[in-house]
């Protein structure tokens, strides 16, 4: 009998040992840790500029928003830019690009570069006021005809309903005067922006690229790419020449191919 129990005990010990050495296939395997390589762009791009965040923010882009025919007052997506960060009072900006600008401004300041906002969101009516002022200006009244006049104005100014500033994603910084950007301070600021703006989600839409059409180079104009590209895509799909009206010269939008030449004339 003792031998019998001894044999049973030996069998149990062997079974347990084999179970330890060869665990059941139903047992949960040990977790495997996978280390992914993270690109520099991922590390330096603000979290709010992710495609998911932008999709949520921009899932309801209306024609009115694309054309600037709305007011940001009372819209919780917009903020009033503090006066110490801008040249003029009462400027609005979409809060996502503005948060990114704050981070960019702080980084620039540490490098000894000053960034101040000179223009941000502009409504259709704001742009119309700029347009009408230039239309009546003596600088353009001597133009041979309306087409020549419009092309002269549109070297640096957009027709109402075609400006990227309608989207709340664009910022003009420091100065729109060429003399500033040709100064030592301006050159330093521009070089810093060229080297660092992308880290905060911004890029220059109007460059000196030879293949680009439309407006002249604007070193002061910086666009929040993750959002503005979605507005751009929506604009091209939604807006036609018939939608751009209500100001002097608007009857020539189609013949001048304003959407193709100017709205689409950006660097990406």
Task: Mark where each language-model region is.
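N-terminal Sec-pathway targeting helices
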Residues: 1-10
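Extracytoplasmic cell-surface/polysaccharide-interacting catalytic and binding patches
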Residues: 11-120, 124-268
